[in-house]
Amino acid sequence: MLKYILSLCLFFNTLILANDFEDFEQEYQKKEVKDSFYAYNKAMSKFNYDLYTYFLRPVALSYKSITPSFIRTGVKNAFDTTRSSFRFINHLLSLEFRKAGEEFGRFCVNVIFGFGLLDSASKTPLKSYEADFGTTLGKWGVGSGPHLVLPLLGPYNVRDALALPVNWFMVPEGYIENFWVGAGVNAALKLNELSFEYEKIDDIYQNSVDYYTFIRDAYEQRRQELIK
């Protein structure tokens, strides 16, 4: 049962980390998306919607109600600090040395002046740029392939789905010997982040004429922007 619950908590990973839907709505341009698995994707999207609505969202709201804001903010900043090395490595693999340098600089500032718990780097000109092994493959010319909705994890495409195992071993919890302990740590961090982001996700589900199509197009457009 514990393993099942921990797995469920991973679902909204992509909704939070792989998309900035508010920015997307401002710059969105309609683009045809290859959706070879449409029927499956549509059904899995409905499954993930129900999972979010009836399990993840209530858990996140309960967590928010009992956890002081400064603790949640500290955990969120610590989570982002642990991801600096992840982004740094992918920038190097993509030969984007300026972005890698900025990411390294942000990490140093946050660790030295914020003890990893404060986003001290936000007060500097240093920027953080989203990157993962899927975007690295894209920058080296690997095509995205058809859109693919994964159970629990949400929207992906074939390239990004194949990059998931590499992504896992680029983050600290991927090196915890017991996989389910590592997954539990990851799930707890993502649950904390959902406590900040649930209103954006609610807006997508409630105000989109067809949330599956919107999320699919938003995901693919965002990923394309990241590899330019």
Regions found by a protein language model. Name each.
Residues 4-13:
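Sec-dependent N-terminal signal peptides
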Residues 16-18:
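Boundary at the C-terminal end of the N-terminal hydrophobic targeting segment
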Residues 20-32, 135-228:
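A structured, mid-to-C-terminal "fold-capping" secondary-structure block
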Residues 29-40, 49, 68:
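Short, membrane-interfacial amphipathic segments enriched in basic
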Residues 54-70:
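Membrane interface segments of multi-pass transport proteins and intramembrane proteases
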Residues 73:
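A small/polar active-site loop signature that marks catalytic segments
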Residues 78-155:
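Mid-length scaffold segments of soluble, non-membrane domains
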